[in-house]
Amino acid sequence: MNLIELQHALRQLRLGGIATVLETRLHQAQTEAMAPIDLISCLVADELTRRGDRLLERRRKHAAFRDPQKTLDHFDFNFNPKMNRSLVFDLATCSFIGKREDALFLGPGGTGKSHLAQAIGQAAIQQGYRVFYREAHVLLDELAEAVVDGTRKEFMETLTTVPLLIIDDFGMRKLPLTAAEDLLEIVMRRYERASTLLTSNRPVEDWGKLLGDVAAVTAMLDRILHHGHVLKCGPRSWRTKTAATTAAGTV
């Protein structure tokens, strides 16, 4: 079996990581007089690295972050110095996911809630957790569509079982009439079973009016806050700062 045939056989065995680097590693083995066990170790490590990278890629794609580039490395904590940094970094360790706890990020628009939520989602993926991200109005629209096409049970199963569900921008857009009922069902089914991270620009006192069902909102908040971490963002807005800077530059 020559090199090309061997690479083809490796791919048939789903060992594409080894097939891709085989020629390079064989050349290295000859150049460095590597022992057979060292060569095999390198090839196995290459395959494991490739599989790990592809798994992370699939999980990021499944999470469907709105802004995949948002990470903690790109967040300026000095812009809002009163933000609880310790809580942010504690959440980024993802220990709250292992404990099946929840998180609630509150504050005006443009204060970094979505950035931090997605950054924590990225950290969770790096640590081996599955994540599902949706803006609140998109999530509820998809749930309504699932009712129409008969896939609500399957979609709800996804929402119930994913280790971290991020519901972003709650209260930013108009919500369907079934929003209170649907959100309460999601929260109840996930309570003490999986972690939910919710962001909102509306104070919790307004949620009853927003959803038109005070009882449902009370039940939902009771569960989120029972084992929940609350992060208050703001008051300064990045978008306001950017707009002011742009306007100043055009004067």
Model-assigned labels for residue ranges:
Residues 46, 123, 127, 189:
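Active-site catalytic microenvironments for nucleophilic, acid-base chemistry
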Residues 1-8, 246-251:
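Intrinsically disordered, low-complexity and often Lys/Arg-enriched segments
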Residues 9-12, 61-84:
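Dynamic helix-loop-helix/coil hinge segments at AAA+ ATPase domain boundaries and subdomain interfaces
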Residues 83-161:
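Conserved P-loop
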Residues 4, 8-11, 20-23, 41-42, ...:
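Solvent-exposed alpha-helical segments within well-ordered globular domains of core cellular machineries
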Residues 7, 17-68:
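Interdomain "pre-motor" coupling segment immediately N-terminal to P-loop NTPase/helicase cores
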